[in-house]
Amino acid sequence: MGYGNRASSKTPAISGLREKHQQDLEKLTLTSQPFKTLRLFVVAVFLYVRRWSSYLLANVGWLILFCSIFVAFAALLVTLDGPHVKHVEELSEYTRFGLWWIFLGVASSIGLGSGLHTFVLYLGPHIALFTIKVMQCGRVDLKSAIYDTIQLKRSPSWLDKPCHEFGSPVFSSGVPLSSILPQVQIEAILWGLGTALGELPPYFISRAASLSGGKMKELETCSGDDNGFIAKRVNQIKSWLLSHSQYLNFFTILILASVPNPLFDLAGIMCGQFEKPFWEFFLATLIGKAIIKTHIQTVFIICVCNNQLLDWVENELIYILSFVPGFASALPELTAKLRLMKEKYLIASPPVSSDINVKKWDLSFASVWNGVVWLMLLNFFGQIVTSTAQRYLKKQQEEELDALTNKSSLTSKKSK
């Protein structure tokens, strides 16, 4: 009797503690508990840095030595004058260009969909602005170098330069897609490479959880109830994918990575959970995201900003409206208005006399755009701080639960 009462009292105690832990996790945010969240975040980062520093010093000391020698050699090249300086500066520009676009790709794919949407913020506008400038100037050789793109706190040199400084137009009517695509292809592929690299952390974390006999939280919660028609349908599709995820292979991963969709967030977790080979997952993700998906998005942006698409829309509208009674007589006037709007939109840069007003408008637009970017950065940083603090708190809660469970087990054994 005594043992039965103790056993029955053990379960409510653990269940109550779990409910309390869940409530504490939900309350731990920067808005509700900012000081506690920041404190746990700082502690978690400190422990993470200390653990990895100890690991690096103990296991890969040769790598640290090599990196130190490389950094010292690079610093020596930068500080010393000579004919090598221009080559070092050029190499620095290429390195900054590559790291910038790869970093934007990583920032876009990490966080299981909550990352920065850098295609909308940077790559998409860059391709659109370059295409519009190409259509205005009638030539594609606008860049001073491959790295002459949008970067942090730096605009490309061709953006505000008038078309007459580039020379006379090479293309009279329209610039073909095959000529525009190579000019923006490298930065697009680098961005796609970053998105593929951003899918690796979920894969490794899920694989480690699978090898230890655990299960990722994202796989457990994706089948939960969600309000809203779209959320329910997306969760149904995710549940279907999970039920068939043991059949994942190179081609299914490639298809999921190639098509822009919100479902690939779980691909890395599923492949890690079912212990798919790393190179099979990474190569399929790399080809799908850095080659196929990137080119689909880039070609779409170029076509939208290219007047060839406007010509096609105009011709299709004229063809369709010609069959509508009453519109045949109004088609010439409508066509003239459409062409006037297109020429006004794609006309070359205005004279220098009105350049001051344009720069003022550009400055205000840039200020608003930078404000939006900084707000998204702050939101992204807040999500990182909150998730890190919650993960650290959950680890402490699991240790507390394990201690309580072990204590209850010892008490039960003694009562026998």
From Swiss-Prot:
Record topological domains on the Cytoplasmic side: 2-59, 124-249, 305-315, 386-416
Positions in coiled-coil regions: none
Keyword Transmembrane helix carried by entry: yes
Residues modified to N-acetylglycine: G2
GO cellular component terms attached to this protein's record: endoplasmic reticulum; endoplasmic reticulum membrane
Role of this protein: Involved in the early secretory pathway. Required for the correct export of secretory products from the endoplasmic reticulum (ER) and involved in the maintenance of ER integrity.
Name recorded for this polypeptide: Vacuole membrane protein KMS2
Protein species of origin: Arabidopsis thaliana
